From Swiss-Prot:
CC annotations in GO: endoplasmic reticulum membrane
Family to which this protein belongs: Belongs to the cytochrome P450 family.
Subcellular location per the Swiss-Prot or TrEMBL entry: Endoplasmic reticulum membrane; Microsome membrane
Protein name per UniProt: Probable cytochrome P450 9f2
Binding site for heme: C460
């Protein structure tokens, strides 16, 4: 009996080894330089074992590529062709975009799937959609992020930002010994903005700190060990996940957002309510609200899942990603007092020019140094660590006289953080220097070396929204407070090694010093 057990174990181990190492010679067979993978974990073992931050691992892999323009790496069993040359990035994302239209098919659903199945909303989002479905949805959503729409949305952001600072002044208990948990503060702000601009809800998470909308959002965006393992399985065992119907996100939270969107659509239709937010725009796209414009432009019938998914991913991306940008901005201003002082002087000047009136969209868009500061934060701490593309038809690249063939199904990887921290493109990359993005210097930045929101037609559709949110928060905080190091501040900043999110060990803590 014991021998039978050992025999079965040996067979299982052999089968696992064969499966786990099946792609190990992928780059060797093509004559492409690569980093030797660890069995099953590829080159990401440190991240999955929670020993190193993914951000640091990707930066190291980029550096190991040396002078190679293409360099092979592995994410678990998945071979990724890392691109280390700006000209090749331009070719992939612009010139030959028709070969690289899609992100890889990790979460995506097909048009044949049950349109009423809400278990995989991320798979029906704009990010995961493919080919013609992506193009149609991109066209549907684009009007929501034009300059005129941003101007309308800014009125709401402005109000929420003022309320957030007012709550700090009114309730000192939320600031422990003048030390503020910036992550908590910023996620509450992004939560309230998105509640209104996407879902049509009025929420104040600074006063009603346990409101349902905020609590459900926290559940969705907090990456526990189990959540990280689910992500790992989604990447490694896509087919099995579909058979077993593994749900990536908490079911209760997902169902909450599904009902929120569908009930809002039903109520608005019954009561003829029109509101300038994402739900209204998606109702127009679906034909629930008929306008001359939508009659002329309707090209596809969207399902309930398609509609809900766009609101869902807008919340998911905005809740966490925008908040992290705000937190890193505050942290860098705290560590670089000279930069903070110069930015404060710009804030003072704008405040004086407004003569007691509310901050306007035009005023904040005209703040050049604030724009430089935020751009430099995005260079040093890009939320999108890397950008991927899946090849949909064979193509051959001529790289320094060598023919490199990329086949249908191959995955291209553009390491954002690697380029942003490469001294070849950004001198002294670890220095926080907003002057890189001044009018005099920004033209010298080599094209396709700075892409915090992606590149080409598949860049982040909500980038302008995220930038506007971050600028509003920093403006109001800096107007009334100086950022100083707190006892809990992580200096120098070290990233946590758990999960996929960018965050310092111990969190984002800032000491607020009241200005006279």
């Amino acid at each position: 009996m014991l021998w039978e057990f050992f025999a079965l174990f040996a067979i299982a181990a052999a089968l696992f080894y064969r499966w786990a190492s099946a792609n190990n010679d992928f780059f060797k067979d093509r004559g492409i330089a690569y980093e030797k993978p660890v069995l099953y974990f590829g080159n990401m073992a440190g991240m999955f074992l929670r020993k190193r931050a993914m951000f640091d691992i990707v930066c190291d892999l980029y550096t190991k590529g040396g002078s190679k323009k293409f360099f092979g790496i592995f994410e678990q069993r998945q071979p990724l062709l890392m691109v280390r040359d700006p000209d090749l990035i331009k070719q992939i994302t612009i010139k030959d975009f028709d070969h690289f239209i899609n992100h890889r098919n990790v979460f995506a659903t097909s048009s044949d799937d049950d349109p009423h199945d809400m278990s995989n909303l991320f798979g029906s989002s704009l990010f995961s959609m493919r080919d013609a479905r992506w193009k149609d949805m991109r066209s549907t959503l684009s009007p929501a992020f034009t300059g005129s729409k941003m101007r309308q949305m800014f009125q709401l952001m402005n109000q929420v930002a003022k309320e957030a600072v007012d709550c700090l002044k009114q309730d000192d208990s939320r600031v422990q010994e003048n030390e503020l948990d910036m992550k908590d503060y910023c996620t509450r702000f992004t939560n309230d903005v998105i509640a209104s601009t996407a879902f049509g809800l009025q929420v104040n998470s600074f006063k009603d700190r346990e409101n349902t909308f905020y609590q459900m959002g926290k559940k969705l965006t907090t990456f526990t060990f189990l959540q990280s393992m689910k992500f790992m399985l989604f990447f490694a065992l896509k087919g099995l996940n579909k058979i077993l119907k593994v749900e990536l996100f908490d079911r209760k939270s997902t169902q909450y957002f599904v009902r929120l969107v569908l009930d809002a659509m039903k109520y608005r239709q019954e009561h003829n309510i029109v509101r300038p937010d994402m739900i209204n725009m998606l109702m127009e796209a679906r034909g629930i609200i008929q306008t001359e414009k939508t009659k002329a432009s309707a090209v596809r019938e969207w399902s309930d899942r398609d509609i809900v998914a766009q609101c869902f991913v807008f919340f998911f991306a905005g809740f966490e990603t925008s908040a992290v940008l705000m937190c890193f901005t505050a942290h860098e201003l705290m560590e670089n007092q000279d930069v903070q002082q110069r930015l404060y002087e710009e804030v003072q000047q704008v405040d004086q020019d407004l003569e007691g009136k509310e901050l306007t969209y035009e005023a904040i868009m005209g703040m050049k140094y604030l724009d430089q500061v935020v751009n430099e934060v995005l260079r040093k701490w890009p939320a999108a660590i890397a950008v991927d593309r899946e090849c949909n038809k064979d193509i051959t690249f001529d790289v320094d006289g060598q023919k490199v063939e990329v086949k249908k199904g191959d995955v291209i990887w553009l390491p954002t953080c690697g380029f942003h921290r490469d001294p070849k493109y950004f001198e002294n990359p670890m220095k926080f220097d907003p002057e890189r993005f001044s009018d005099e210097n920004k033209e010298s930045i080599q094209p396709f070396t700075y892409f915090p929101f992606g590149l080409g037609q598949r860049n982040c559709i909500g980038s302008r929204f995220a930038l506007l949110e971050a600028k509003a928060v920093i403006y109001y905080l800096l107007k009334d407070y100086r950022f100083a190091p707190a006892k809990k501040s992580c200096i120098p900043l070290e990233l946590i090694t758990s999960g996929f999110q960018l965050s310092p060990k111990g969190g984002f803590w800032i000491k607020l010093v009241q200005r006279n």
